[in-house]
Design a protein with these regions (language model features):
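Bacterial N-terminal signal peptides
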Residues: 6-16
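N-terminal (or domain-start) structured segment
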Residues: 22-114, 152, 160, 175-203, ...
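An extracytoplasmic/periplasmic, membrane-proximal ligand-sensing/linker region
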Residues: 27-29, 237-238, 260-320
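Hinge/capping helix and adjacent helix->loop/strand transition within the periplasmic-binding protein
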Residues: 30, 77-86, 101-189, 236, ...
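Stable alpha-helical elements in mature extracytoplasmic
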Residues: 41-45, 49, 70, 74, ...
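Solvent-exposed coil/turn segments that connect beta secondary-structure elements
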Residues: 93-94, 123, 133, 160, ...
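C-terminal lobe and pocket-closing loops
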Residues: 123, 209-275, 304-307
Length: 320
């Protein structure tokens, strides 16, 4: 895997290699790895922000899609890149934190040591949703139903070890509901299964179900964090629980060892893009909220989430 990733990283760097003997950074194109397929919400976000960053730095930002292994391939490419500021990535916590804990053979990196945080870019809440005609109309009723009907409440997620699966496990720990996580190969199959009556709930990124929520086909039960378009949907904290659900966050990173002066040029340009009102307006309909957080706070969040995910994974028997 590392040999393969190294070869791909080499081809990526050649494609966007800066002029030799550059006097000041940046003097050439910067490659932006997008570890997901074209058309994904992260891809749309990355391309919108790349245009803004290019204007700020006055050099081209070249988006390069490198999907595969749930985003892990793109992250590993970054870890193989030279720490010169000419290769960065926009990646989410599913590939950075969750996969590195659950599948270290494929996700052969440590998000705490193998990357240089450059700034949080955006968040998308996770939502627990049920069909609009479900007999449980709120979180309390859902938990009561699950306890009275052990093993009967199946909850679809986007895959094994996904953010949604860990949300289900968090709810089970907090309430004793005994919800059964059912992994699908992505969000769309899970939504289809719920609408078709094959499962009783889903936990997915909010943006994947907003249309169904507005039509009444689905009903939201709880969110990982507040979202302005659905102000009445509660969070776990508002329901009296101390452990929040996991949301989805996306952030910019460079390779480990990125020089401070290079990061000092990148960070303000990325911050400008993340705080752009035009970009925020473009992404909001996708269920994405732009939110800037500086590198030190981003690293602290990664440490905390890494600890939580690892703890749940061990208690659930997912890892030793």
């Amino acid at each position: 895997m590392k040999h393969f990733a190294g070869a791909l990283a080499g081809s990526l760097l050649i494609a966007v290699a800066p002029p030799l003997h550059a006097e000041a950074y940046p003097k050439g194109a910067i490659g932006l790895i997008i570890p997901l397929a074209p058309g994904d919400a992260t891809d749309t976000s990355a391309r919108a922000m790349a245009e803004d960053v290019a204007r700020e730095l006055k050099v081209p930002i070249v988006p390069v899609n490198r999907p595969g292994a749930g985003g892990s391939l793109g992250v590993e490419l970054l870890t193989k890149a030279k720490p010169d500021g000419y290769t960065i990535i926009l990646a989410n916590n599913a590939s950075l934190v969750f996969r590195s804990i659950l599948d270290p053979k494929t996700a052969n990196y440590n998000p705490l040591t193998d990357l240089t945080p450059l700034g949080l870019a955006m968040r998308s809440p996770s939502i627990f949703a049920v069909r609009g005609d479900a007999p449980y109309r709120n979180f309390k009723e859902l938990v009561e139903y699950a306890k009275k009907n052990p093993g009967k409440l199946r909850v679809g997620t986007a895959g094994v070890g996904s953010v949604g699966e860990f949300c289900v496990r968090t709810i089970n720990t907090a309430t004793g509901a005994g919800l059964i996580p059912i992994p699908f190969t992505g969000a769309s199959p899970a939504v289809s299964a719920l609408l078709g009556g094959h499962i009783e709930g889903i936990v997915l990124a909010l943006g994947t179900v907003t249309a169904h929520l507005r039509s009444g086909a689905l009903r939201g039960i709880v969110l990982s964090s507040k979202y302005p378009d659905f102000p009445d949907l509660p969070t776990m904290a508002e329901l009296g629980y101390s452990e929040p659900l996991f949301g989805i966050w996306v952030a910019f990173f460079g390779p480990a060892g990125l020089p401070a002066d290079v990061a000092g040029k990148l960070v303000p340009a990325l911050e400008h893009a993340i705080k752009s009102p035009d970009i925020a307006a473009k992404l909001k309909p996708l269920g994405i909220l732009t939110e800037y957080s500086p590198p030190d706070r981003l690293l602290a969040e990664i440490r905390n989430e890494h600890r939580r995910v690892e703890d749940i994974a061990k208690k659930s028997g997912l890892v030793k």
